[in-house]
Amino acid sequence: DPWGGIATPRLPRRLPRVLEVEQVARLLAIVEADLDPVPGDDPERAALRSALAFRDRALVETAYAAGLRISELASATLGSLEIRRGELRVMGKGRKERVGLLGRPACQAIADYLAEGRPVLLERRTDASEVLPPEIFLNHLGAPLGVRGLRYRFDRLCARAGLPVGVSPHTLRHSFATHLLDGGADLRVVQELLGHENLATTQVYTHVSPGRLQSVYREAHPRARRLSTP
């Protein structure tokens, strides 16, 4: 084989797209604003609008707080949720279970949705079965909100927030990891939270945190401090 001794070129690894903290805040502001009542809405329409707003806020808060894949978000069940402990058990790739952690804003958003939003959506079910769906997140007809529905809703929210075209639910997962590293989190802890089997998969996020690299460099290198400008 004349080509046997020739190594194939290695393609550069594509770096993930990441949102700035301010951009995530804009997205969250959009879902918060949707909770405000719209003057002139009839009661039924107002109830549905409010229920979907509670759901969307819980969706975004949960996705960002726990760094979930979209499939994990869609399949999350009530039985896997421990609000008091701030934990959500999810089934990741390879049928491997892990625990996603939820901060106070995410826990509050989920609690509000379960109390004010989900019951309204369940009332709109067209399924005659008495068995209620175990999934946490439901669509406007009280059925489980699937991956396609999640993507569609997320696209609409991102467009309204003025975020770049192409931002996806997975972008929030990338942002979750990068913001943790920027905040000083240990790489192996982030690996565990993301459910990555190999540390090398998580290390890609170290290449998209220039702010963190600059900070560590300035603190560690004896001649890294810049001269002050007159």
Could you say what each language-model-derived stretch is?
Residues 1-230:
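Conserved catalytic core of the tyrosine transesterase superfamily
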